[in-house]
């Protein structure tokens, strides 16, 4: 296991938080363009200062805790999602020699951290002592547990081809070709599961405003609500980075750009895809989402593993 220098570690973690905050502006601006309207354009050039204005507004809002809530759990819950998402970035290989930690079970570490994030939503729904919050947290738990299975199975094809759980070795194994082509079914399954894991539209059923008034964060306001918000965008960035690492060669690309630039550009493409889904697709019913997972995603990912193993055994 190799650990980066303290300056690199601090720089990476701070950069991820700044990027997550900036993505709020990107999403609002892009959705405005796609919906033929301006989006935020009042604070700073092109509205770039809107994020700072929103942060100031949230900071000065009343930090209210419902009197019927379980106060210690209510306070801790928002921090869990931010901490787990930030810790997930420590195994992401951004470029050769650029990363926090390089160890052999980086992919398993990512799955472990992503599964812990749902505790934030479950505890928030429980501690709020609100029926809508509790229903949202139960939806979040069932959705995350189900789609974690499919995400893990989708990644197994890549592990079989690379022969390693080390994310840096998986990237280096793609020097002769990205895994998105031989693992296209696995890529599609991983992408769908990532959207469901992030609880992003159209799979934002745990917080569906039209159904359960905001779900698990119904009772939250101020900085605590902001932590949930930033945690969501950290999850989008983390899952986009893992998608790029597993299926699109990570930092690998033509020499006219440095490796870190290739990694950032590829990750940005998937972040914009996450945003586009919100603007383009309607939300399915909850039973349809769960049925799709177990009746379509599970057979697809299992078939992908079987085919990958069969091809690997037949080709010397």
Swiss-Prot record:
It comes from Methylococcus capsulatus (strain ATCC 33009 / NCIMB 11132 / Bath). PANTHER family: NADH DEHYDROGENASE SUBUNIT 1, NADH-UBIQUINONE OXIDOREDUCTASE CHAIN 1. GO terms for cellular component: plasma membrane. Belongs to the complex I subunit 1 family. It is found in: Cell inner membrane. This is NADH-quinone oxidoreductase subunit H. It is an enzyme of class 7 (translocase). The keyword Cell membrane applies. GO terms for molecular function: NADH dehydrogenase activity; oxidoreductase activity, acting on NAD(P)H, quinone or similar compound as acceptor; quinone binding. Pfam families: NADHdh. NDH-1 shuttles electrons from NADH, via FMN and iron-sulfur (Fe-S) centers, to quinones in the respiratory chain. The immediate electron acceptor for the enzyme in this species is believed to be ubiquinone. Couples the redox reaction to proton translocation (for every two electrons transferred, four hydrogen ions are translocated across the cytoplasmic membrane), and thus conserves the redox energy in a proton gradient. This subunit may bind ubiquinone. Its EC number is 7.1.1.-. It is a multi-pass membrane protein. Keywords: Cell inner membrane, Cell membrane, Membrane, NAD, Quinone, Translocase, Transmembrane, Transmembrane helix, Ubiquinone. The gene is nuoH.
């Amino acid at each position: 296991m190799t650990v980066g220098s303290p300056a690199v570690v601090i720089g990476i973690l701070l950069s991820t938080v700044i990027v997550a905050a900036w993505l709020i502006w990107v999403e609002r601006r892009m959705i405005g363009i796609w919906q033929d309207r301006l989006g935020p354009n009042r604070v700073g050039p092109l509205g770039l200062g809107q994020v700072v204005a929103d942060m100031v507004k949230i900071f000065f809002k009343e930090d209210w805790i419902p009197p019927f809530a379980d106060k210690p759990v209510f306070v801790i819950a928002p921090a869990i999602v931010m901490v787990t998402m930030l810790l997930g970035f420590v195994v992401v290989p951004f470029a050769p020699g650029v990363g926090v930690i390089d160890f052999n079970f980086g992919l398993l570490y990512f799955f472990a951290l992503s599964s812990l994030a749902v505790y934030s939503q479950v505890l928030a729904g429980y501690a709020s002592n609100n029926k809508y919050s509790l229903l949202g947290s139960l939806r979040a738990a069932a959705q995350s547990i189900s789609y974690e299975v499919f995400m893990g199975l989708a990644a197994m094809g890549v592990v079989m081809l690379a022969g390693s759980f080390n994310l840096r070795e998986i990237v280096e194994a793609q020097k002769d070709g990205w895994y998105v082509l031989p693992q296209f079914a696995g890529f599609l399954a991983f992408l769908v599961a990532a959207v469901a894991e992030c609880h992003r539209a159209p799979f934002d059923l745990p917080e569906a405003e039209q159904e359960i008034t905001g779900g698990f964060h119904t009772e939250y306001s101020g900085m605590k609500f902001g932590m949930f918000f930033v945690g969501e965008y950290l999850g989008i960035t983390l899952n986009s980075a893992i998608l790029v690492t597993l299926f699109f060669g990570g930092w690998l690309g033509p020499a006219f750009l440095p490796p870190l630039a290739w990694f950032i550009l590829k990750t940005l493409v998937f972040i914009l895809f996450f945003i586009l889904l919100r603007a383009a697709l309607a939300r399915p019913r909850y039973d349809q989402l769960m049925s799709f997972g177990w009746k379509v995603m599970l057979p697809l990912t299992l078939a992908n593993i079987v085919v990958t193993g069969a091809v690997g055994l037949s080709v010397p």
